[in-house]
Amino acid sequence: MSRKNKKIKKKIFVDTRYNSRIVAKFANRMMYDGKKSISESILYSSIDLLADKLEDSDKMAVFCKALDNIKPLVEVRSRRVGGATYQVPVEVREERREALAMKWIIFAARKASGRSMKEKLSNELLNAYNSTGAAFKKKEDTHRMAEANKAFTHYRW
């Protein structure tokens, strides 16, 4: 039996504008140097820009659909068996799927050149909504890698 204590999960509070845990988590992931207000203002303005581009009234539905399009179903993990390292495909927990999707969208937005962060983030969210862009490509690459290594699924733990 494990002697380690279970890690107590930190409670994420909902954000002020949309009363959503997902938006609050996204703002926390975007944050630099503890400057949450800046992170939130960038996120809120990029969601507004996204809704204006799509002319959709329900901003949260658009944001959630963009996030859902990026969530990976499977990923590969390295497993060492008898001196050889195999890339073993495993299913991704819902919590990790959400975290990976947020991470990929933010990374793709930061990597885009020029313009302000709110414009880059709204463009990346729009691309995610339309199942295109760098974050979606990252998801497809992850799925392709898992598909290529499907033969090693019996090494799962």
Curated annotation (Swiss-Prot):
Q: What is this protein called?
A: Small ribosomal subunit protein uS7
Per UniProt, which keywords does this protein have?
A: Ribonucleoprotein, Ribosomal protein, RNA-binding, rRNA-binding, tRNA-binding
What's the source species for this entry? Borreliella afzelii (strain PKo) (Borrelia afzelii)
User: Cross-referenced NCBIfam families, in alphabetical order?
Assistant: rpsG_bact
Ribonucleoprotein among the record's keywords?
yes
Extent of the signal sequence: none
GO molecular function terms listed in the Swiss-Prot or TrEMBL record: rRNA binding; structural constituent of ribosome; tRNA binding
Could you tell me which HAMAP family the record lists for this protein? Ribosomal_uS7_B (MF_00480_B)
Record function comment: One of the primary rRNA binding proteins, it binds directly to 16S rRNA where it nucleates assembly of the head domain of the 30S subunit. Is located at the subunit interface close to the decoding center, probably blocks exit of the E-site tRNA.
Q: Which family does it belong to?
A: Belongs to the universal ribosomal protein uS7 family.
The subunit field of the Swiss-Prot or TrEMBL record says: Part of the 30S ribosomal subunit. Contacts proteins S9 and S11.
- Keyword flag Amino-acid biosynthesis: no
| GO CC, any one term | small ribosomal subunit
Biological process GO annotation list? Answer: translation
